Amino acid sequence: MFRRLLIATVVGILAAFAVAGFRHAMLLLEWLFLNNDSGSLVNAATNLSPWRRLLTPALGGLAAGLLLMGWQKFTQQRPHAPTDYMEALQTDGQFDYAASLVKSLASLLVVTSGSAIGREGAMILLAALAASCFAQCFTPRQEWKLWIACGAAAGMAAAYRAPLAGSLFIAEVLFGTMMLASLGPVIISAVVALLVSNLINHSDALLYSVQLSVTVLARDYALIISTGVLAGLCGPLLLTLMNACHRGFVSLKLAPPWQLALGGLIVGLLSLFTPAVWGNGYSTVQSFLTAPPLLMIIAGIFLCKLFAVLASSGSGAPGGVFTPTLFIGLAIGMLYGRSLGLWFPDGEEITLLLGLTGMATLLAATTHAPIMSTLMICEMTGEYQLLPGLLIACVIASVISRTLHRDSIYRQHTAKHS
């Protein structure tokens, strides 16, 4: 057991450096090509001329597509093993390392060029790859899946600063691929990754800064639960839209570079209306949490961002949809809160409260992982007083969503690529 905990510590350290490496590569490319050193793609888009804002996501998608197609032609074959950590956990615990690194590089290109796709997916993949490489060198074959799981959880902890949620992500989303008794090493890896990541970044700040001064009353619990019901209905709709957009792009029968370029061009067109559509949504989430906008502004940005996410994910842009889902949930919750706020004197606090609830419940509705979703929002924002209400709402959202749409976003993703 001590040996496993020691290896889990090493995996956590490797994962933290993998995530930091991807993050610094992003910052370097943004500085080189976008003349942006703020770390915010929304700021980068705001400072670009309209024609560059239009074309940059398309060019990034084109470059990523050419890279993926070029690699496939160079090797004369499709990847001989999984290039996704979920698939690796559900098979024999092995990766096609070269193809996985090329996929991560393609993700780096689309993410830094403004596509509305999550960067954290590539970060978690790189963390799992580092763990897998170490495991194949120093551990027996029957443990490889465990260390990939530890790497994925550690990558999630480093990316989102949420070690408990990262550990439960493995237990809930990938349930059945590992014994719950193995959660000890997973948690150790996640916590170590967070601590090392904090040292690298010289900061232990929360991912999102929120000033929520409300005391949760019986009325607030009712509003939180009703938001869970709303998210439970919206989650399956979002999954259906993503699936439909993917089928729509596939039906065009374009070569991968042109398909990704088309997705990027749609993002570029939408960014002419608002630069907030660029990137994974982190900057926009933080700005909404700092100062919730008016109803019509939320609605406008929400629609543009939703179409951008659908275009990016539908075109096959390599990356995650975890953070974009957080923004969509925040916007749905805030739209609901703004509508209800017309009838309450503390409308601003209700809007913020239901925005946070929307983040957790839509995440639960799309992942079918209510405990992970609850802890994720609490760890990212530090608002632990919301935990009881969020847990109830997330369970309700997950049950409704699972009833209406059998597959979670991750099972849908795995089925699509199998």
UniProtKB/Swiss-Prot annotation:
A Gene Ontology BP annotation from the UniProt entry: response to acidic pH
One cellular-component annotation, GO: chloride channel complex
Membrane topology: Multi-pass membrane protein
Subcellular location: Cell inner membrane
The keyword Cell membrane appears for this protein: yes
InterPro entries for the chain: Cl-channel_core, Cl-channel_volt-gated_ClcB, ClC, ClC-type_chloride_channel
Keywords, sorted A to Z: Cell inner membrane, Cell membrane, Chloride, Chloride channel, Ion channel, Ion transport, Membrane, Transmembrane, Transmembrane helix, Transport, Voltage-gated channel
Family: Belongs to the chloride channel (TC 2.A.49) family. ClcB subfamily.
HAMAP family: CLC_ClcB
Protein name from the UniProt record: Voltage-gated ClC-type chloride channel ClcB
Classification lineage: Bacteria, Pseudomonadati, Pseudomonadota, Gammaproteobacteria, Enterobacterales
Name of the coding gene: clcB
